[in-house]
């Protein structure tokens, strides 16, 4: 399992602001290999797994064939994500293209946008063909996209702990 804990509070991470809950969950994402901040590790591991699957098919070891077959496999696996969240899929494609091109700043920005970070440069979002920030409505779709990536990467799922103890301590007991 991948695991994440989100501290729910009235001011910093209210439960009704799903975009904030999603962002905090991605910031605290942990796996067995990476304690905190495993979001990029999960993405990179998923793309690596695609290439490993292509190599296991025996599709050829030259770079051009590997890249072409990896792109085809990427599109097959992104089909479900694309139907649910086209922006998530577009940003994943652009992230991979930036990684391949050695454009680490764009890749970093897109990983930030995919994880719900609000202050990503417009030029980076434009490179992926996406607009705006991850909002309340997109947050659950993005979470669904992450779950598909986790499943495809061999994880059993995501254990998400929503800790509301701070909020509950302020609730009046005499009501």
Predicted segment positions?
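P-loop NTPase nucleotide-binding core
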Residues: 1-153
């Amino acid at each position: 399992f991948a695991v994440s804990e989100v501290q729910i509070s009235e001011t910093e991470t209210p439960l009704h602001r799903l975009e904030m809950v999603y962002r905090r969950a991605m910031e605290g994402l942990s796996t067995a290999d990476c304690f905190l901040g495993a979001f990029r590790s999960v993405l990179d591991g998923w793309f690596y797994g695609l290439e490993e699957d292509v190599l296991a098919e025996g599709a050829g070891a030259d770079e051009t064939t590997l890249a072409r077959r990896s792109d085809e496999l990427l599109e097959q696996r992104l089909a479900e994500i694309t139907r649910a969240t086209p922006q998530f899929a577009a940003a994943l494609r652009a992230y991979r293209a930036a990684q391949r091109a050695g454009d680490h700043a764009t890749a970093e920005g897109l990983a930030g946008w995919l994880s719900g970070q609000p202050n990503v440069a417009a030029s980076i979002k434009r490179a992926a063909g996406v607009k705006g920030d991850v909002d309340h409505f997109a947050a659950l779709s993005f979470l669904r996209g992450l779950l598909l990536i986790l499943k495809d990467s061999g994880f059993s799922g995501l254990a998400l702990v929503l800790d509301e103890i701070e909020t509950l301590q302020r609730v009046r007991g005499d009501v």
